[in-house]
């Protein structure tokens, strides 16, 4: 079975002669609007560029990027300066009274350079780098969810537009049928029961049309939430190309490349490095401290002094009240948790992959079945109408045949929608539902550019991407 279908949706009302003039006009306007309507790739591009959930996830990644320069800062010196000035009065009692007015002034600058921090700096840097990698995968997951929601919203609107047009057409057909039945009742060809049956079906059709209008309004609102604008009349979407050919291939790719799985892997690596970072607090710490100072004791007496020093400091932890040991144990438990979560995400990715694949296979089988059902229902309706003309069929038989055709057409539209959504679900399951793989006409967000701009930054308050 070839599942790499790229055929567009297609649904037609072959018996257009049965539609009212108003329905024909509505369908004509709908078809004309698709010439410049928003396509599915355009809608996905708009969501990629403007969706607030995705933009917030990018900002979150940029904030996590800052963990790396924060850890790298522990390789660098810290510099502090200080100054003081004041007033001091001294009185000395003796044979000769004397007083002195002193105005002390001091200034100093201190530089502290870490030499060894028990391996915490290296471990902390590696932890932060793995946290960045994990957050990038989380961003990929958010991007996939946003694009999948956008594709789903698009196809829901398309389906509901199509169903509404079918219901409008059916309402027009039943209105004509009721009018014809009343005319025949006037001349005694049919009974009052036939008229009542036609009236009942028309009332039901009106109710169905109103319900489909409500469904379309809800779908349009969901479209606006995800994509950022209300849709016009949407052209038929297509099943995405380049899908894996077999279910086993989908599962194999998903358990390796699904972003939720890869994010869990990097999170576990970060947790391992955190164990080493916390353990480093049990090791000695060595730093080099340099100091320059100037002191002026008095404005009356020349007592200026300058000093300079360079000191190596060693701090050896002996006992920290058990706090560090507890935090090491905590870090080990977190690492164990993250390792278990990798398996959890792999199982979840496999389940999602199988479900998406089965949904795709089912939708494609249903399309073939419903296409056959529509063709058969059209033939049956035409035959019932001809038989009614010679008295072999009743008005109820015609109404039933028309309803069967409508049901088949609505089911076909629903299956076509399900096929497209399932195709995008398969792409999402294998981690390929992104702007690059789907070829969206957008500037792809560069995660490396923001990271490089801050990784080795020693100072500066400007933040990339902030508004």
Predicted regions mapped to residue ranges:
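Gram-negative bacterial Sec-dependent N-terminal signal peptides
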Residues: 2-32
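Acidic, low-complexity, intrinsically disordered peripheral segments
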Residues: 2-4, 10, 33, 413-467
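Periplasmic alpha-helical coiled-coil/stalk elements that build and connect Gram-negative outer-membrane
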Residues: 2-8, 143-255, 356-359, 363, ...
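Bacterial Sec-pathway N-terminal export signals of envelope proteins
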Residues: 33-82, 114-115, 230-269, 318, ...
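Short flexible linkers and secondary-structure junctions
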Residues: 36-156, 160, 164, 174-175, ...
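Sec/SRP-type N-terminal targeting helices
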Residues: 55-59, 69-76, 80, 115-143, ...
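Small/polar, glycine/serine/threonine/aspartate-rich low-complexity segments that form flexible
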Residues: 82-114, 124, 234-244, 276, ...
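Metallo-beta-lactamase
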Residues: 212, 266, 415
